[in-house]
Amino acid sequence: ASVLSVQGAIAAAFLIFIILTSNPFLRLGDPPPEGQGLNPILADPGLAIHPPLLYLGYVGFSVAFAFAIGALIHGRIDAVWARFVRPWTLLAWIFLTLGIAMGSYWAYYELGWGGWWFWDPVENASLMPWLMGTALLHSTIVMEKRDALKVWTVLLSILTFSLSLLGTFLVRSGVITSVHSFASDPGRGLFILGILVFFIGGGLTLFALRAPALRQGGLFAPVSREGALVVNNLFLAASTVAVLLGT
């Protein structure tokens, strides 16, 4: 019930955002006879797929976030929890991977962004949740098999969705200068920032208060598959921090 409540709150927040800032049912008083048309750079079949795939990945990570908040509220987390979270994380990761790949291919043949990857702030905004989502995916495997890394997995669930919201804010707010920015709006960016502060600030506060109460799980040998996955997690987390600081 708590998981569905968190998901409902996220959906309600973005529904309010759409109604207040981009109401699709708002009547135009003096509509222009002809529109300006789409930016020629965006008139591409790949662009009908690239943004939806990215946002399916972002939204998918909200499920892991909701499960993490539910675990913190009830103070209970186990291998069954990881078994529920891992498929959603994998699905979100696949969508985000396909979205990034499609965007890279489009950037390559448009010859405008410096090749496949230019380390542009908007590109980095999608890479950061992908890196953290990869770490979360590996962490849930360790938790499901060994009942370990409970607190770390919950934290990764919160941070992955945090970076998804942060990426949305950076792209839409106009805070950063990017050749990828086609629809920046500071007003809408502030609304997204408010959503980010509410959910992520609340999630991290709840984590700080409730994480010590989570029962620690099993142990595993440092030289093992699980140990390698932990090293992988640390590398991905460090890479995310490096990209964030560079952005």
Positions of predicted regions on the chain:
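Polytopic transmembrane helical bundles with strong interfacial aromatic enrichment
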Residues: 1-246
